[in-house]
Amino acid sequence: MGSVGMTTSVTISFAERYATSGQFDAVFREGMMLVDATAGYLEGAGRRDSKALRPAGALIYATESMRLTTRLLELASWLVIRRGLKSGEISSDEAQKKRRRLKLTAIGRPEHVKGFGELPARLRELIEASFALHDRIVLLDRALEQPETVIAAIATNPVGDQVARLSAAFDSAQ
């Protein structure tokens, strides 16, 4: 009865749990679908769209499509590393070595580039989707690099200490 006000702490790594969960699988699928959609667009309709642009627009298209594919390559690499770790194909040490080669840094958005709004709508959609995925992966990656969080498994009962003292007082009186 004297332990009513006590708490027990356990270490929980939310990022590790997330990276091995079904939610990670959904992000993985989303990332791979974005890679496929981008490749399909750039190799198909994107070629036609780029030919319809003025020279300045074609230069912006070429620049932004290269940035898009580079960003997606980095994101896909990160996802494949995490999936390999999750499935046991690679060790934690191997995953860390491979991860260090990636450059998942915060990067500027191209909306400020003069003429960005003139790019084909589909390319802009793919760029925006890649940044949304990038932001999610960077947050998860940072969380994975942080020390684990200690969380109280049982919340402290504000009255628990008083109940424990009363119980101890009555137990000692008898």
Q: Language-model segments: what does each one mean?
A:
Residues 2-174:
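Surface-exposed peri-terminal alpha-helical interaction modules
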